[in-house]
Structures are given as C-alpha cells and as structure tokens.
Amino acid sequence: LIVGDSGCDGTQAATAAQTLIDSGVSAIVGAACSGATTGAIAVAAPAGVPMVSYASTSPALTTADDNGHFFRVVPSDAQQAVALTDVAAAAGASNPAVLYMTNDYGSGLGDNFASNWSGSVCTSVGYDPSEGSYDASALAQSVIDGGCDSALLMSYATDGAAIMEALSSQGFKGTIIGADGLADAA
C-alpha cells in the first residue's frame, strides 16, 4: 500500500497521482474531493492507471476525459440534487435559499438543484469554504433579507455548522436542509 495526499486540491492531487504512478501502482483509490479527483484523472488516465473514488460526486466527473479508467461508488450530485428537490418539496419549501461552496462539489450540486427545482429560488449564494474565507453571518443575512422560507446547504460539516449557527442566532425560523457533505463522524 502506497499512500499519497491529495490535500483536496487538484494540483496537489495530480502531483500525488504522478508520484504513485512513478512508484509503480496498478490502481489508485481516491481521491475523496471532486476537485482533487479531477486533477488526479488528468495524470492517471493518460498513464492507463485506473482510479476508483468513494466520495467524489461532481456531475462533471461523469463526462471526464478518463479513457474509461475512472470509477466511483457513489452517485453523481446530479442524482442527489433531484433527491434534495424532493426533500425540499416534502418539507413544504416554496422559496428556498441555496448556499453552496464554490468548489466542484458545491457548485455542481447547487447548479443541479436550481435546475431541478420547479419553483423559484429566493437567493443563491456561493462561498469559499476555506476557514476564514467566508462570513457565515452575511450568508445567513442573505437568507433572511431574501424572505426565504428554507435554506439548502451544499456545505461541509464545519462551514455548514457555522452557517446554521448564524441562521439560528439571526432568528431564522425556516427549514434547513443539508446535502451529504454536512455529514460528520463526530
């Protein structure tokens, strides 16, 4: 077993994949993050090294130029977006906010939700999930200012928790719906 670290970054993942290939691996398991997987595919596919990801869900990976060498064991976010529209509708949402990370995962999921949602979206705001790069209070305020009845979070656990805390502290009484990225082992 040879381990490489993608750092959840496409450039770092490409470097790690090349190091693994140079070490003679016959396959790569990973990466977890969609952007990192995209970077690794750019190196692994031309080298004929198969990759399987357990967590990369970006719809863009469905049509990636992978020479038939990329596989994943989770569905695309295009499918999750359809499920989220069903959940939002069942929760009685009619004017949801969409708060999404501006990475491959969040952008893809947010775009697919918006295109599958049959009603209007009161606000759609992207943010950089890097710690210190976003203002959870400002994101919450955009939901409140938009008169949204619900908020969909295409977030990871840490930034999602900060946004939910900000929504609560600012008095938001609507429904909060999270995508799979909010899941955390803690």
Regions found by a protein language model. Give the residues of each.
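Venus flytrap/periplasmic-binding-protein-like
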Residues: 59, 170-186
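Short, flexible micro-motifs
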Residues: 33, 38, 109, 181-184
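Beta-alpha junction/loop-to-helix N-cap segments that form part of ligand/metal-binding clefts
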Residues: 1-61, 73, 127-136, 159-161
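Extracellular/periplasmic Venus flytrap/periplasmic-binding protein
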Residues: 15, 59-60, 68-171
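Short, solvent-exposed loop/beta-turn-alpha elements that line the ligand-binding surface or hinge
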Residues: 64
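Short, mixed-charge, low-aromatic patches
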Residues: 37-46, 67-70, 171-178
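Periplasmic-binding protein-like
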Residues: 20-32, 50-54, 95-100, 147-157, ...
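Beta-strand segments within the central parallel beta-sheet cores of soluble alpha/beta enzyme folds
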Residues: 1-2, 123-124, 177
